[in-house]
């Protein structure tokens, strides 16, 4: 398992600050949910954590090593990334996509070993796409593509996984199976989610983003209050407990005209 920390992380485009002084941590073996409305900075933060973009200021660390000091191969051997929308050549098979997860452990011209093949087989089985392994990428549904990408990530045998809206395109069964699976992995997960009930049920820790800033962070039970959800999302909600599991439950009641956060931005523009 590994630890990810971000300190004083900021990022801008054409003078517009999209992330502002972000502080967050994902500790060994925990699932950390990034929550917030569209445009709040969740995907941008994940790209900075993955090293796909460099911050204007601040530092990302894996354990005690700065991301800047980790080579690409060293990072790929410990970190897997599952993005929202991934394209692949139409004629690549599901199995070939998953085999890409073994690339960091092979020489440039080396063939897959029997050990690699066993890892790929296990990853295909674990996310329920083994029966589709010979199908072409372009024939898959959105949910099947998402599960194939997760299998590719598992084939890396990572210490950390970053996932951007992994439940998008998935039916209810596969949403639950995917998040159940994350809970069984011996890895540290940072996952961007829209569904607050899934976050409350599966995340050990949540970070609430709005307008590129951290609004609050902590356990779902302490952070996901009716007041915060109205402020950030602009909806009135009822917070209670699901009677069977005892998990925190969010029931959406009505949209409000203007969120407190957005009014504050208008009153004090940056």
Regions found by a protein language model. Name each.
Residues 232-270:
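ABC ATPase nucleotide-binding domains
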Residues 161-165, 170:
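Catalytic Walker B motif of ABC-type/P-loop ATPase nucleotide-binding domains
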Residues 35-37:
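The feature captures the beta-strand-to-loop junction immediately N-terminal to the Walker
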Residues 58-66, 75:
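Conserved ABC transporter NBD signature motif
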Residues 50:
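Helix-to-loop junction immediately C-terminal to a conserved catalytic motif
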